[in-house]
Amino acid sequence: MAHKKGVGSSKNGRESESKRLGVKVYGGEMAKAGNILVRQRGTVHHPGENVGIGKDHTLYALKSGVVVFTRKKNDRSYVSIKTES
């Protein structure tokens, strides 16, 4: 028999923090060079004109302009920046 009462611990408290993924600047909105446009896991959206891609697949603006989302024949979503020129 146990001589000490077992001390239980909570079975909760393991929830991982949300990673705040998703579109940060939507189509038709202005974006400055360097702005993060989309945070994602894998290439859900692909980089188009004037958009760069980071090592964690984050899409960011290379130039300032208006954000444009397009879907091409291969059914991929592309994010581009339309500059004022």
From Swiss-Prot:
Keyword list, A-Z: Ribonucleoprotein, Ribosomal protein
Record keyword Magnesium present: no
Single GO molecular function: structural constituent of ribosome
GO cellular component: cytosolic large ribosomal subunit
Record-linked PROSITE patterns: RIBOSOMAL_L27 (PS00831)
Entry superkingdom: Bacteria
Region (Disordered): 1-21
GO BP term, example: translation
UniProt-listed Pfam families: Ribosomal_L27
Keyword Metal-binding tagged: no
Annotated PANTHER family: LARGE RIBOSOMAL SUBUNIT PROTEIN BL27M (PTHR15893:SF0), RIBOSOMAL PROTEIN L27 (PTHR15893)
NCBIfam families given in the database record: L27
Family classification: Belongs to the bacterial ribosomal protein bL27 family.
HAMAP family: Ribosomal_bL27
Protein name: Large ribosomal subunit protein bL27
Organism whose genome encodes this protein: Porphyromonas gingivalis (strain ATCC BAA-308 / W83)
Name of the gene encoding the protein in the UniProt record: rpmA
